[in-house]
Amino acid sequence: LCDRRQRQMCIRDRSQCVHNISGEQISVDISTLVQNLRERADWYTGLIRTQEWVTDENGNGWFNGYYDNHGRPVEGKRDNHVRMMLTGQVFSVMGNVADDAQTAAIIKSADLYLYKKEVGGYRLNTDFKEEKFDLGRMFGFAYGEKENGAVFSHMTVMYANALYQRGFVKEGYKALYTLLEQAMNTPVSLMYPGIPEYFDADGKGKYPYLTGAASWYMMTMVTQIFGFRGEWGDLVLEPKILLRQFDESGNYSAQFPFRGQTYAVVYQNPQKKEYGDYRITEVWLDGQRYAGETNTGICIPFAVLEGKENHTLRIVLG
């Protein structure tokens, strides 16, 4: 990659180009373009991992995710106050910018500075102790309302999804379940069971009609916890189910649509092993044992599944 001066020149040239689009087209070699984009992504990932990693006096670490309108980093320790925001951590974990050690550190810091079970779990940010309008409208709200320190359901669920993707299953479950518990605690949340946009400083659910969290919650349940998802057109089953989520018989079941078909799926955990200890030992497709390679997950080619509208899948864990 080019040095800093060359990068700045490239940015300047591109900024000028957008004002003078000629309409001419050129052919670009796709492999060259892919390589170029990957190199840029790797460079930015390395930069963020080192330059934007902040710590407190005890070594707890997380990413600075924002700069204010004066070009100053927002997060870290300022005037004896910790400034941490959940959003930057979510996308760092989900986008594989945070390595495994950094992800573990982020979880620890989020539990220390952002988590409050009584109000639904992970708040969007710590209390900055100032009206910082050079960062945005969030400081127009009292701490604990909306974007300023509320438990924002959408970001909490995305945090859980990111943790599941990275294999931090118990931690992802904690984020999801605390949110659910708060919503179901009607005397405090003062709402019907469901997911609100956010929980305020008193744990009250606000704006249940204004959130994308429900769809993210369901997607996380289906594709990560149940592990039922498509991959390049084929069917993947990779369960991330904790022991407490299985029923008394050690089963966990549901029905899903996939590519115009319906699947009745049951996971069986007869030895009642915890996540991390079990593997897929048997797969039964429509009553016949499937001989594909198994471990913590399995991929079934869609060619094997074509020709029927309804399927049954029984996956034995051991």
Q: What residues fall within each predicted segment?
A:
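Single conserved hydrophobic/aromatic residue that forms the stacking wall/gate
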Residues: 1-13
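Structural helix-adjacent loops and short alpha-helical linkers that scaffold large soluble proteins
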Residues: 13-42, 52, 96-108, 163-174, ...
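Extended glycan-interaction surfaces of carbohydrate-active proteins
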Residues: 17, 42-151, 177-180, 184-199
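Alpha-helix capping and helix-loop boundary segments enriched in small/acidic/polar residues
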Residues: 28-39, 76-83, 143-151, 163, ...
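A general alpha-helix detector
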Residues: 88-89, 155-159
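Non-catalytic C-terminal accessory modules of carbohydrate-active enzymes
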Residues: 112-117, 129, 140-148, 158-318
